[in-house]
C-alpha cells in the first residue's frame, strides 16, 4: 500500500474546518427481478438518473445498459464499469421504469434506478440529444504537470492579485481567536515535534479553491484538479474548475495555508492539495458529482478526501425509498471503492446540533426544492458522514469566546 502514516494532525485540521438534500412520489413496488426502481414521474422534464446494475455484472452487461439508454429516451452521461454504475439524463417521465423493463428483457440484472435530484436539471446542463459519454478517469488535462505549479513547493513571491478576507464571526480582531481552532488544539506545539512527515495529498471536494490566494500559492496541484459540478462529468478546463464561492478556499487554508506571516497558518503547510469542485452554481452537490469526485480522487493519487457538506438534495437518504435508493447506492459504491484503494475519508456531520445516529424527522429536505416538513427519516443516513468507514466529525465552538482557545471548554 502506498498510503501510510503522518495524517493525524490533518484529521484534527479537517475536523475544525467542517461546518459545511419536490415533493416525491411514494415508494414504488418495484419488481423483485429489477430491484428498486423509481416510479414514472408525474410530468416530463429534464432529469438525471443513477443506474446501478448488480455488483457482479461484467463489461458486456455494462455495455448493454449503455446501449439501451438511448432506446428509452435517455443520454448516457458517465459510465463506471468498476462500480457497476451509470448516470443518464432524460426528459421522459417514464425513463426509470422503461429502462428497467428494457434491461430485464435483455437479461441484465438491476440493483436500482432512480433520480439524483428533485428539481429539474437546468437547460444549461442539457445533455439529451447529443451528449458524449465521459470517461471519468481520463478527462483531458488542462495543463501538464510540468506546466503547472510544483506540488508542495510555495512560490517565492505571492502574486499581486485581489484577495478576499473571510472573517470568523466568533473571532476578535487582532487576537489569537482569528486562528482559534489551531490554537485550541495547540497545532503549533504539535508542529514543533521533530518527526518525519510522509508527503500527503488531500483532495478537497468542495466549491473549488482559489489557488492564487497568497496563503495557498504552491499548495494546489492544478494539474490534478478538476470540476465535477456539471452532470458529474469531469472537466479540467480552468474556467470550469475555478472556485464558485469561498468555502473551498477557506477549508484549504485551514488545512495547508503557507506559514508566511500573512493570514492564517495551515495545520499541514507541506501538504499538497487537489481541488475537486463538486458544488454547482446553486451551491448544491448532487450524487453524480460526488461519484465523479471520488472516482477522480481514487485514480489521481489522493491520500485523504475532505468532505465538508451533505450530499444534496436529501440531508438524510433512505435506502428503501426507490426515489432515493439508486443515488445513495451509487455514492456508497464510489466511497467504498475509494476506501478499498487506501484513501482516508473525512466528512463533516453538520452543525445542526442533532443526533445524526438516531434521526427521526427532517424539515430541511429536499434542498433543491420546497422542503417537506417533518419528513420521517428513521433508518436514513447522511452522506458521506454516515457511510461505513468514514471518519465523521462535527463542528465545535468555545463555550466562552473570551477565554484563551488553548484552555477553553469546547462544545
Regions found by a protein language model. Give the residues of each.
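Secretory targeting and sorting signals
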Residues: 1-30
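C-terminal region of N-terminal signal peptides and the immediate post-cleavage residues
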Residues: 19-43, 261
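Autoinhibitory propeptides
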Residues: 32-39, 55, 63-176, 398-400
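Short glycine-/aliphatic-rich beta-strand segments at the starts of folded cytosolic domains
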Residues: 43-55
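Loop/turn elements at helix/coil->beta-strand transitions in domains of secreted/extracellular proteins
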Residues: 108-109, 198-201, 269-274, 299-305, ...
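Active-site core segment of subtilase-fold serine proteases
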Residues: 158-270, 292-326, 359
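Substrate-binding/access-modulating region of protease and related hydrolase catalytic domains
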Residues: 278-383
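Extracellular S/T/G-rich loop segment that most often corresponds to the catalytic His/Ser-adjacent loop
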Residues: 369-411
Amino acid at each position: 500500500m502506498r498510503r501510510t502514516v503522518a495524517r493525524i494532525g490533518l484529521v484534527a485540521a479537517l475536523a475544525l474546518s467542517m461546518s459545511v438534500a419536490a415533493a416525491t412520489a411514494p415508494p414504488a413496488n418495484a419488481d423483485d427481478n429489477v430491484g428498486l426502481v423509481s416510479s414514472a414521474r408525474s410530468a416530463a422534464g429534464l432529469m438525471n438518473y443513477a443506474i446501478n446494475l448488480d455488483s457482479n455484472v461484467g463489461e458486456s452487461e455494462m455495455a448493454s445498459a449503455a446501449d439501451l439508454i438511448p432506446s428509452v429516451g435517455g443520454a448516457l452521461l458517465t459510465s463506471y464499469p468498476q462500480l457497476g454504475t451509470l448516470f443518464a439524463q432524460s426528459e421522459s417521465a417514464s425513463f426509470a421504469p422503461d429502462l428497467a423493463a428494457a434491461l430485464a428483457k435483455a437479461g441484465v440484472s438491476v440493483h436500482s434506478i432512480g433520480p439524483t435530484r428533485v428539481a429539474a436539471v437546468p437547460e444549461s446542463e442539457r445533455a439529451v440529444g447529443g451528449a458524449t459519454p465521459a470517461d471519468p478517469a481520463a478527462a483531458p488535462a488542462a495543463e501538464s504537470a510540468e506546466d503547472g505549479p510544483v506540488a508542495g513547493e510555495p512560490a517565492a513571491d505571492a502574486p499581486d492579485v485581489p484577495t478576499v478576507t473571510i472573517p470568523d464571526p466568533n473571532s476578535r480582531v487582532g487576537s489569537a481567536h482569528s486562528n482559534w481552532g489551531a490554537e485550541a488544539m495547540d497545532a503549533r506545539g504539535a508542529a514543533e515535534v521533530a518527526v518525519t512527515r510522509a508527503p500527503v495529498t488531500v483532495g478537497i471536494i468542495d466549491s473549488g479553491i482559489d489557488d492564487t490566494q497568497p496563503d495557498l500559492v504552491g499548495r494546489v496541484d492544478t494539474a490534478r484538479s478538476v470540476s465535477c459540478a456539471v452532470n458529474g462529468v469531469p472537466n479540467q478546463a480552468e474556467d470550469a474548475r475555478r472556485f464558485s464561492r469561498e468555502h473551498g478556499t477557506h477549508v484549504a487554508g485551514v488545512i495547508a495555508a503557507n506559514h508566511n506571516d500573512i493570514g492564517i497558518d495551515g495545520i499541514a503547510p507541506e501538504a499538497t492539495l487537489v481541488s475537486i469542485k463538486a458544488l454547482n452554481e446553486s451551491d448544491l452537490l448532487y450524487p453524480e458529482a460526488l461519484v465523479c469526485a471520488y472516482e477522480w480522487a481514487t485514480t489521481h493519487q489522493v491520500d485523504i478526501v475532505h468532505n465538508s457538506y451533505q450530499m444534496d438534495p436529501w440531508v438524510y437518504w433512505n435506502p428503501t425509498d426507490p426515489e432515493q435508493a439508486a443515488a445513495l447506492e451509487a455514492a456508497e459504491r464510489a466511497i467504498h471503492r475509494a476506501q478499498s484503494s487506501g484513501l482516508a475519508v473525512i466528512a463533516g456531520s453538520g452543525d445542526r446540533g442533532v443526533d445524526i445516529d438516531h434521526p427521526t424527522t427532517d424539515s430541511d429536505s429536499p434542498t433543491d426544492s420546497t422542503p417537506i416538513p417533518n419528513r420521517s427519516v428513521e433508518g436514513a443516513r447522511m452522506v458521506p458522514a454516515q457511510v461505513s468507514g468514514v471518519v465523521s466529525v462535527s463542528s465545535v465552538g468555545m463555550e466562552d469566546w473570551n477565554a484563551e482557545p488553548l484552555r477553553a471548554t469546547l462544545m
